[in-house]
From Swiss-Prot:
Pathway stated in the Swiss-Prot or TrEMBL entry: Amino-acid biosynthesis; L-histidine biosynthesis; L-histidine from 5-phospho-alpha-D-ribose 1-diphosphate: step 6/9
Subcellular location: Cytoplasm
Organism expressing this protein natively: Leifsonia xyli subsp. xyli (strain CTCB07)
Main localization category: cytoplasm
A GO BP annotation: L-histidine biosynthetic process
Encoding gene per record: hisB
EC number from the UniProt entry: 4.2.1.19
Protein name, entry field: Imidazoleglycerol-phosphate dehydratase
Length: 200
Protein backbone atom coordinates (compact mmCIF):
# COMPACT_ATOMS: atom_id res chain seq x y z
CA UNK A 1 0.00 0.00 0.00
CA UNK A 2 1.56 3.29 -1.11
CA UNK A 3 1.41 6.51 0.87
CA UNK A 4 -1.60 8.50 -0.29
CA UNK A 5 -0.29 11.98 0.38
CA UNK A 6 0.05 15.23 -1.52
CA UNK A 7 1.55 18.67 -0.89
CA UNK A 8 0.74 21.57 -3.20
CA UNK A 9 1.29 25.32 -3.47
CA UNK A 10 -0.69 27.76 -5.59
CA UNK A 11 0.14 31.44 -5.99
CA UNK A 12 -1.96 33.94 -7.91
CA UNK A 13 -2.50 37.68 -7.71
CA UNK A 14 -5.62 36.92 -5.64
CA UNK A 15 -4.44 34.27 -3.17
CA UNK A 16 -1.60 32.12 -1.90
CA UNK A 17 -2.32 28.54 -0.84
CA UNK A 18 -0.13 25.91 0.83
CA UNK A 19 -1.91 22.59 1.40
CA UNK A 20 -0.90 19.08 2.40
CA UNK A 21 -3.01 16.01 3.10
CA UNK A 22 -2.83 12.35 3.98
CA UNK A 23 -5.84 10.28 2.92
CA UNK A 24 -4.91 7.56 5.41
CA UNK A 25 -4.73 9.83 8.42
CA UNK A 26 -6.72 10.17 11.62
CA UNK A 27 -8.57 13.40 10.88
CA UNK A 28 -5.94 15.73 12.34
CA UNK A 29 -6.03 19.24 10.92
CA UNK A 30 -4.40 22.63 11.04
CA UNK A 31 -6.46 25.07 9.01
CA UNK A 32 -5.72 28.78 8.57
CA UNK A 33 -7.57 30.31 5.62
CA UNK A 34 -8.26 33.74 7.19
CA UNK A 35 -11.98 32.91 6.87
CA UNK A 36 -13.00 31.51 10.30
CA UNK A 37 -16.20 29.71 9.29
CA UNK A 38 -14.40 28.11 6.34
CA UNK A 39 -11.73 26.90 8.77
CA UNK A 40 -14.55 25.34 10.78
CA UNK A 41 -15.99 23.56 7.73
CA UNK A 42 -12.62 22.24 6.54
CA UNK A 43 -11.80 21.03 10.05
CA UNK A 44 -15.08 19.10 10.03
CA UNK A 45 -14.24 17.64 6.60
CA UNK A 46 -10.85 16.44 7.84
CA UNK A 47 -12.24 14.96 11.06
CA UNK A 48 -15.11 13.06 9.47
CA UNK A 49 -13.24 11.85 6.38
CA UNK A 50 -10.22 10.71 8.45
CA UNK A 51 -8.00 12.85 6.24
CA UNK A 52 -5.07 14.67 7.82
CA UNK A 53 -5.23 18.18 6.39
CA UNK A 54 -2.99 21.22 6.69
CA UNK A 55 -3.98 24.46 4.98
CA UNK A 56 -2.40 27.89 5.10
CA UNK A 57 -4.00 30.50 2.87
CA UNK A 58 -3.96 34.24 2.40
CA UNK A 59 -5.80 36.36 -0.11
CA UNK A 60 -7.54 39.59 -1.01
CA UNK A 61 -10.20 39.15 1.66
CA UNK A 62 -10.46 42.92 2.01
CA UNK A 63 -12.28 42.74 -1.34
CA UNK A 64 -14.22 39.50 -0.75
CA UNK A 65 -13.52 36.02 0.60
CA UNK A 66 -14.65 34.40 -2.66
CA UNK A 67 -11.18 34.10 -4.21
CA UNK A 68 -9.59 32.55 -1.13
CA UNK A 69 -12.46 30.15 -0.48
CA UNK A 70 -12.65 28.93 -4.08
CA UNK A 71 -8.87 28.70 -4.52
CA UNK A 72 -8.51 26.53 -1.42
CA UNK A 73 -11.21 24.27 -2.87
CA UNK A 74 -9.29 24.07 -6.15
CA UNK A 75 -6.04 23.07 -4.43
CA UNK A 76 -7.84 20.61 -2.14
CA UNK A 77 -9.38 18.93 -5.18
CA UNK A 78 -6.02 18.77 -6.96
CA UNK A 79 -4.38 17.27 -3.87
CA UNK A 80 -7.12 14.65 -3.53
CA UNK A 81 -6.71 13.64 -7.16
CA UNK A 82 -2.95 13.34 -6.80
CA UNK A 83 -3.13 11.39 -3.53
CA UNK A 84 -5.74 8.91 -4.84
CA UNK A 85 -3.35 7.68 -7.53
CA UNK A 86 -4.81 5.02 -9.84
CA UNK A 87 -7.50 4.10 -7.24
CA UNK A 88 -6.69 0.39 -7.39
CA UNK A 89 -8.39 -1.58 -4.62
CA UNK A 90 -10.68 1.23 -3.53
CA UNK A 91 -14.37 1.03 -2.75
CA UNK A 92 -14.88 3.89 -5.24
CA UNK A 93 -18.41 4.75 -4.05
CA UNK A 94 -19.57 6.28 -0.80
CA UNK A 95 -22.79 7.68 0.62
CA UNK A 96 -23.88 9.28 3.87
CA UNK A 97 -26.96 10.80 5.47
CA UNK A 98 -25.91 13.22 8.20
CA UNK A 99 -28.04 15.25 10.64
CA UNK A 100 -27.08 18.37 12.54
CA UNK A 101 -29.99 19.20 14.79
CA UNK A 102 -32.82 20.22 12.41
CA UNK A 103 -30.64 19.97 9.27
CA UNK A 104 -30.32 16.73 7.30
CA UNK A 105 -28.03 16.25 4.30
CA UNK A 106 -27.32 13.34 1.96
CA UNK A 107 -24.05 13.08 0.05
CA UNK A 108 -22.97 10.51 -2.53
CA UNK A 109 -19.46 10.33 -3.98
CA UNK A 110 -18.06 8.38 -6.94
CA UNK A 111 -14.30 8.50 -7.55
CA UNK A 112 -15.19 8.22 -11.20
CA UNK A 113 -12.53 10.29 -12.92
CA UNK A 114 -15.45 12.31 -14.32
CA UNK A 115 -15.98 15.69 -12.66
CA UNK A 116 -19.63 16.39 -11.94
CA UNK A 117 -21.64 18.07 -9.20
CA UNK A 118 -25.34 17.88 -8.38
CA UNK A 119 -26.09 20.25 -5.51
CA UNK A 120 -29.69 20.72 -4.47
CA UNK A 121 -32.19 21.37 -1.72
CA UNK A 122 -30.81 24.42 0.06
CA UNK A 123 -33.72 26.60 1.23
CA UNK A 124 -34.61 29.72 -0.72
CA UNK A 125 -32.31 32.60 0.17
CA UNK A 126 -29.65 30.37 1.72
CA UNK A 127 -27.03 31.64 -0.71
CA UNK A 128 -27.43 35.20 0.63
CA UNK A 129 -27.02 34.36 4.32
CA UNK A 130 -23.84 35.63 5.94
CA UNK A 131 -22.44 32.96 8.26
CA UNK A 132 -19.76 33.85 10.78
CA UNK A 133 -19.39 37.40 9.51
CA UNK A 134 -17.56 36.62 6.24
CA UNK A 135 -18.84 33.43 4.61
CA UNK A 136 -22.00 33.59 2.48
CA UNK A 137 -24.11 30.51 1.82
CA UNK A 138 -23.33 30.70 -1.90
CA UNK A 139 -19.74 29.73 -1.10
CA UNK A 140 -20.79 26.18 -0.17
CA UNK A 141 -21.63 25.32 -3.76
CA UNK A 142 -18.46 27.00 -5.02
CA UNK A 143 -16.35 24.81 -2.74
CA UNK A 144 -18.02 21.58 -3.85
CA UNK A 145 -17.65 22.63 -7.49
CA UNK A 146 -13.96 23.38 -7.01
CA UNK A 147 -13.26 20.11 -5.21
CA UNK A 148 -15.31 17.92 -7.55
CA UNK A 149 -13.94 19.37 -10.79
CA UNK A 150 -10.31 19.38 -9.66
CA UNK A 151 -10.44 15.97 -7.99
CA UNK A 152 -12.33 14.56 -11.00
CA UNK A 153 -15.04 13.02 -8.85
CA UNK A 154 -18.82 12.87 -9.14
CA UNK A 155 -20.54 14.43 -6.13
CA UNK A 156 -24.20 14.66 -5.21
CA UNK A 157 -25.09 16.79 -2.18
CA UNK A 158 -28.77 17.13 -1.31
CA UNK A 159 -30.16 19.11 1.60
CA UNK A 160 -33.13 17.07 2.79
CA UNK A 161 -34.18 19.63 5.36
CA UNK A 162 -32.93 22.42 7.56
CA UNK A 163 -33.47 25.95 8.78
CA UNK A 164 -30.27 27.31 10.34
CA UNK A 165 -27.67 28.26 7.68
CA UNK A 166 -24.75 27.27 9.92
CA UNK A 167 -26.25 23.84 10.55
CA UNK A 168 -27.05 23.27 6.87
CA UNK A 169 -23.57 24.22 5.65
CA UNK A 170 -21.83 22.16 8.32
CA UNK A 171 -24.05 19.13 7.68
CA UNK A 172 -23.22 19.39 3.96
CA UNK A 173 -19.49 19.23 4.65
CA UNK A 174 -19.86 16.42 7.18
CA UNK A 175 -22.01 14.36 4.82
CA UNK A 176 -19.52 14.89 1.99
CA UNK A 177 -16.70 13.90 4.33
CA UNK A 178 -18.39 10.67 5.41
CA UNK A 179 -19.21 9.72 1.83
CA UNK A 180 -15.64 10.48 0.73
CA UNK A 181 -14.30 8.41 3.62
CA UNK A 182 -16.22 5.37 2.34
CA UNK A 183 -15.22 5.93 -1.27
CA UNK A 184 -11.48 6.25 -0.57
CA UNK A 185 -11.36 3.20 1.70
CA UNK A 186 -9.63 0.05 0.53
CA UNK A 187 -11.96 -2.89 -0.12
CA UNK A 188 -10.27 -6.28 0.42
CA UNK A 189 -12.64 -7.85 -2.12
CA UNK A 190 -11.62 -5.45 -4.90
CA UNK A 191 -8.76 -6.58 -7.11
CA UNK A 192 -7.30 -3.86 -9.28
CA UNK A 193 -9.12 -0.77 -10.46
CA UNK A 194 -12.87 -0.79 -9.66
CA UNK A 195 -14.10 -0.14 -13.20
CA UNK A 196 -14.95 -2.30 -16.20
CA UNK A 197 -12.94 0.19 -18.27
CA UNK A 198 -9.79 -0.65 -16.34
CA UNK A 199 -9.13 2.99 -15.50
CA UNK A 200 -10.67 5.77 -13.42
Amino acid sequence: MTNRTASLRRETSESGIELSLDLDGTGASEIHTSVPFYDHLLTAFAKHSLTDLRVRASGDTEIDVHHTVEDVGIVLGQAIRQALGDKAGLSRYGDALVPLDEALVQAVVDLSGRPYLVHAGEPSGFEFHLIGGHFTGSMVRHVFEAISFNAAITTHVTVVGGRDPHHIAEAEFKAFARAFRQAKAYDPLVSGIPSTKGAL
